[in-house]
Amino acid sequence: MPVAVESAIPYPTPRKVDLAHHLSTEARIRQPNPIKSVWKAAQVRPGIINMGNGDPHHTLYPISSMNFIVPSLEGDHPVEAWRTGTSKTLVLSSHKDAPSTLSLRTAFAYGAGAGLPAVREALADLGARIHAPPNHTVCLSLGNADALTKCFRLFGDPDDSFLCEEFTFSAMTNAALALGIRWVPVRVDGGGLLPEDLERVMRCWDEKKQGKRPHVLYTVPCSQNPTGSTISLERRRRIYEVAHIYDIIIIEDDPYYFLQYDLQINQNTLKEHGYTRAMSEVLPRSFLSMDIDGRVVRLDSFSKVLAPGIRLGWITSSPFFADKLDMLTDSSTQHPHGLGQAYLAELLGPTGWGADGLMKWVHSLAREYERRRDLFVSVFDAKVAPTGCASAEVPQSGMFVWIQVHLETHPRFVVRTPDSGSDDEGDVLGAVMAAPGVLGEVARGGPITNTEQLMSELLRKLVESGVIMIPASTFAIVDRSGSTLSPIGDRANYLRATFVGTDETIRDGLTIFAQALEEFFNLK
């Protein structure tokens, strides 16, 4: 679906790479839905009489029109105005028998699995302006969870190994386990996935001992869930280079991409070219934007910038992979729901916000979440940091803060020396906390500290105190391939907290958290 638009990012020159060998057995043998194939072929003839499909006739739909009342986007901060009830509104109408961006007779009928053209073209235009992907196409999904599970089926066979961050969103990685896919964790730090560890895993892989070499990397590059880290441009380039060298498909799951903080957009660009161009200059470069091989499958979602219940997102990939995803959708979930597509068509259409209006909303939304992040950090510094029991990285994007609990200062923290199996709190402790990979290499069989036990006790303490955060163990990818140099249990001294709640929730929650830490560490 080529779209000629102006972009702040130069279009890279694609190179022809055959990636068909990455397809799963299911994807290779899947045949197009034969009825859908006939229906698609018929679309080339305008006004054709449809006597083939079993479509309920639009005159019998019990609906004639819908109105969507949305913010008008007047003023510099529309999200603040909408939140406080001072915003003017804009009424978007979608009709069955009157002119609309997307007629309800079309939206509510059976459609193509890839989605209706009005929505796909609007999203392709937006993607071209922000990412400038070479020779890529867009198809719709029912949100990123749907898109990701379809990608697992597209690329994964039983006993395949996929790569991911060592702490990641377990609800999604668990979906792959049911397909017989095994996860290989890659180390992370405050800046996200470490390209040198990715390269080490691939370089040292022994197919005789470990099975087939991993050929897919699943990553959340912006506000990685749960760590909140964002991968820098330099790291992205190095990761893509490793992917090219070792022939890895990159699934770029980026639902928090538009929630970037501390951005300084160019006011001259904003005045001359609008929000989309101004935002494209300061948003992080995606893996998609540098994909000259066609090995990136990017997943975007409206869940974080509009509402999660909309259950609509979009997948950007090479036409080859898009065609395979289309066949999978036509034989499974079918087309995305018409109500959501009608809403998006009007919102992004000529009488609605358009792409530029969406970017204005996104910029304003990020400012509001940035305010809440700053409040979280301020309260954390005032209440939690003075205890000395925990610290936190300030996230650049997204909704999460990754809190490190300093268990090394807990009176019951112990380290089992690898040679004797005894407990020792001496010099070994310093070695574990400073460089867990060095000591952990001796103890690949399992954790050498009681981190998991203490974190479990802390979680119970938090619940009893009236606050809940998600422990790192929930997101930990246990290495069963033998690639990891140190047990992840010894690095699971973290909690994931969110700052998307109300100001009162943030203040009260962190106050309780600080008190619970003091009691847990026997400081009170």
Curated annotation (Swiss-Prot):
- Example of a GO MF term: pyridoxal phosphate binding
**Keyword Transferase in annotation:** yes
The record's function comment reads:
The L-tyrosine:2-oxoglutarate aminotransferase atrD and the atromentin synthetase atrA catalyze consecutive steps to turn over L-tyrosine into atromentin, which represents the generic precursor molecule for the entire terphenylquinone and pulvinic acid family of pigments, which are widely distributed secondary metabolites in homobasidiomycetes. The first step is catalyzed by atrD which converts L-tyrosine in to 4-hydroxyphenylpyruvate (4-HPP).
Q: Which Pfam families match?
A: Aminotran_1_2
Tell me the superkingdom of the source. Eukaryota
Its keywords, alphabetically, are: Aminotransferase, Pyridoxal phosphate, Transferase
Q: What pathway does the annotation place this protein in?
A: Secondary metabolite biosynthesis
- Broadest EC class? transferase
What family does the entry list? Belongs to the class-I pyridoxal-phosphate-dependent aminotransferase family.
What use has been found for this protein in biotech? Atromentin has been shown to induce caspase-3 and poly (ADP-ribose) polymerase (PARP) in human leukemia U937 cells. It also has anticoagulant activity. Moreover, atromentin has antimicrobial activity. It acts especially as an inhibitor of FabK, the enoyl-acyl carrier protein (ACP) reductase of S.pneumoniae.
As for pH, the annotation reads: Optimum pH is 9.0.
What this protein is called in its record is: L-tyrosine:2-oxoglutarate aminotransferase atrD
- What are the required cofactors? pyridoxal 5'-phosphate
**Enzyme Commission no:** 2.6.1.5
Question: What Gene Ontology biological process does one annotation of this record name?
Answer: alpha-amino acid metabolic process
Q: How does its activity depend on thermal conditions?
A: Optimum temperature is 37 degrees Celsius.
